[in-house]
Swiss-Prot record:
Homodimer. It comes from Pseudomonas savastanoi pv. phaseolicola (strain 1448A / Race 6). The gene is pyrF. PANTHER family: OROTIDINE 5'-PHOSPHATE DECARBOXYLASE. It holds the Pfam family OMPdecase. Pathway: Pyrimidine metabolism; UMP biosynthesis via de novo pathway; UMP from orotate: step 2/2. This is Orotidine 5'-phosphate decarboxylase. CDD domains: OMP_decarboxylase_like (cd04725). The active site is at K64. The keyword Lyase applies. GO terms for cellular component: cytosol. One of its GO terms (molecular function) is orotidine-5'-phosphate decarboxylase activity.
């Protein structure tokens, strides 16, 4: 059974181990999980995952793997062997890539991480998609990629809260992980398609990724507690 009792995932978006652990030491693993992204992982490698797990945290390894099927599957396998709770891949890598990742996890013994697909990044709007040759609404592309992810056997999707309701209706078995969550009154920063924590859960999100409103708060523990209270 998970030690964490809430849907909150705090993003440890820091350049150094020291900064990340300084924040982690102010957080309660019963109230949140933590996300390790590219900057921190490249700076610290697998050691940061082990250290966070030893502190009681379940770790979402947010590296968004996207490569040929075998290479991506081996990366997912390596993440699983580190003991991460969740790992993600880009759905735009295609059905064969995602299926290879699912299969490599099923061949392992022991606990399996949640395998999550990334649809359309929350910073992207229609004009951004048009710039890469997709002249469609982001939600249309999200639904296309979601169908591929479900067919490949993924456990869930990373998506904007504004896509959550449609995704939950179309794919009720998939767990939805939503970045771009901003408590009421927070700055939007570079996340465009955002909702508050309560709005995101009501829309169908299962896990909420929150970064700067907690990590940059004067009192991160208090900020986390306020989010948890909003969700109660």
């Amino acid at each position: 059974m998970s030690a964490c009792q809430t849907p909150v995932i705090v993003a440890l978006d820091f350049p150094t181990r020291e900064a990340a652990l300084r924040l982690a030491d102010q957080l309660d693993p019963k109230l949140c999980r933590v996300k390790v992204g590219k900057e921190l992982f490249i700076s610290c490698a697998a050691d940061i995952v082990e250290t966070l797990r030893n502190k009681g945290f379940e770790v979402f390894l947010d590296l968004k793997f996207h490569d040929i099927p075998n290479t991506t599957a081996m990366a997912v396998k390596a993440a699983a062997e580190m003991g991460v709770w969740m790992v993600n891949v880009h759905c735009s890598g295609g059905l064969r890539m995602m299926t290879a990742c699912r299969e490599v996890l099923e061949q392992r013994s022991g606990p399996q991480p949640l395998l999550i697909g990334v649809t359309v990044l929350t910073s992207m709007e229609r004009e951004d998609l048009a710039g890469i040759g997709l002249d469609i609404d982001p939600q249309v592309q999200v639904l296309r990629l979601a169908a591929l992810a479900e067919k490949a056997g993924l456990d869930g999707l990373v998506c904007s809260a504004l896509e959550a309701q449609a995704l939950k209706a179309a794919h009720p078995s998939l767990q939805l992980v939503t970045p771009g969550i901003r408590p009421a009154g927070s700055a939007q920063d570079d996340q465009r398609r955002i909702l508050t924590p309560r709005q995101a859960l009501d829309a169908g999100s299962d896990h909420l990724v929150i970064g700067r409103p907690i990590s940059q708060a004067a009192d991160p523990a208090k900020a986390l507690a306020a989010v948890v209270a909003e969700l109660a």
